[in-house]
């Protein structure tokens, strides 16, 4: 990776020592910051097949200095406002608090159950701001940390936890009128559908379809993770793909874009179904029903009446709810497209 700082429009002296930029006797300066990495897609080695990040960073920096601060600000606002200004959300009795900072209002809201409609409005729009700011890069959706992180190695590596976190990042996207910001999820799921075929074969012995565990990254890692004494309550889970493709169905459901359904959502949903059709087994207590086993409920465990504490079991509600929803929507998709009638039946 590479970060470049370039200074322009200053009346003082500029010098550099080691990794420090010094500005002396300066009354005004425009500092341009450019970040680039060698990331070149989920299936490209960042060193052997990486993007020319040094060249790209230098080119961007040389290009940016042709713009003044005001010009860059206006360009940014034009890009941002075309998304943000789509929604005007108002609640009755909402009043702006000129005295307390937002963090104090949050504490009073959470700890003392204060009624604060204005804070609820603000939080809704803050969520939209975060998604606008962190869901632009093809194939790289908003992750656990968002656009900025306080450390080089951010918590949980800044990856994607797909046993709820990534999905819930995008639950507001359609209803909050930010539909096109789902596109980075499409790219990630396409990558997972490729790596997930190897996952299905190597870990579960299933040669049809694809699946992924609870965690992935920009390289579309799909295998289960966890070593040593780490818990099966999160590592032993094969439903990540089945749940994540529901985000794609939601996008179709809101937009009614049949080209998107035909070319993107439906093939990925069907691939997830193919795996599940081979993963389901007959319930040993009721052969008329199909269940999953082994099964876990995301990051949960249970205690029996005899005091046994465990995580793995037969036919958990979460698994079956995800599967039922996916099967139902895949059948709907086949009907809309007029294809795969026998498969749907």
Question: Residues of each region from the PLM?
Answer:
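Conserved aromatic-histidine-acidic binding/catalytic patches
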Residues: 21, 68, 111-119, 157, ...
């Amino acid at each position: 990776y590479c970060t470049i700082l370039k200074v322009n429009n200053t009346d003082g002296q500029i010098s550099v020592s080691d990794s420090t930029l010094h500005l002396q006797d300066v009354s005004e300066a425009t500092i341009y910051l450019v970040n680039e990495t060698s990331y070149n897609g989920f299936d490209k080695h960042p060193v052997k097949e990486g993007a020319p990040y040094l060249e790209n960073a230098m080119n961007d920096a040389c290009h940016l200095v042709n713009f003044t601060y005001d010009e860059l600000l206006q360009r940014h606002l034009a890009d941002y406002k075309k998304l943000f200004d789509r929604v005007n959300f108002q609640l009755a009795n909402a009043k702006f608090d000129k005295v307390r900072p937002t963090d104090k209002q949050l504490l009073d809201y959470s700890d003392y159950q204060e009624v604060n409609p204005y804070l609820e409005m603000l939080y809704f729009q803050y969520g939209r701001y975060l998604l606008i700011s962190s869901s632009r890069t093809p194939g790289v959706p908003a992750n656990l940390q968002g656009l900025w992180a306080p450390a080089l190695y951010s918590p949980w590596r800044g990856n994607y936890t797909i046993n709820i976190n990534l999905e819930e990042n995008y639950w507001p996207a359609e209803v909050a009128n930010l539909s096109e910001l789902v596109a980075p999820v499409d790219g990630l799921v396409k990558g997972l559908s490729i790596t997930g075929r190897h996952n299905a074969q190597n870990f579960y012995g299933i040669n049809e379809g694809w699946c992924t565990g609870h965690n992935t990254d920009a390289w579309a890692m799909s295998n289960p993770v966890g070593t040593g004494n780490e818990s099966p309550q999160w590592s032993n889970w094969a439903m990540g793909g089945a749940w994540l493709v529901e985000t794609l169905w939601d996008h179709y459901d809101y937009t009614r874009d049949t080209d998107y359904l035909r070319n993107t959502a439906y093939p990925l949903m069907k691939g997830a179904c193919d795996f599940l059709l081979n993963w389901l087994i007959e319930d040993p207590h009721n052969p008329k029903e199909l269940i999953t086993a082994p099964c876990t409920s995301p990051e949960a465990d249970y205690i029996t009446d005899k005091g046994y504490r465990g995580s793995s079991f037969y036919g958990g509600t979460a698994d079956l709810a995800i599967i039922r929803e996916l099967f139902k929507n895949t059948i709907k998709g086949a009907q809309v497209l007029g294809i795969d009638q026998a498969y749907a039946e």
